[in-house]
Amino acid sequence: MQIEGILGPIEEQEARIKNPLVLAYIGDSIYDVYVRTALVKKSRQQVNALNQRASGTVNARAQAQAAAILEEEMLTDEEKDILRRGRNAHPGTVAKNMSVADYKRATGLEALVGYLFLSGKYARLEEIMQRVLQEFGV
């Protein structure tokens, strides 16, 4: 995949030193786009049904579960480090309907997704997101 312009990559070192919450900020959107795109491509459902299915995968509990699976199965040491940095970041607030542990793990996964996207590691991002989508039957 080749992406240029505003959506194009930045230097890997620049991506690596970004605040993990900044990586999670962009990673949240990229994760959401992957899930929604997969659902649209595989389904003829109406928007409400698509949104319901997406919400089963795009939430802190599911993302925390995905982070644990990825960490155990396929992440490199560098990717585990980025996930850890995201998990250990202090966001200031946590949504009321989830555990702090799930929220932190989800933030770690979002940071990893953001890092891979910003640094232009699109093939690796695709591998990781394919595994996540497989886990949740998307």
What residue ranges belong to the model's regions?
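Double-stranded RNA-binding/processing signature
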Residues: 1-138
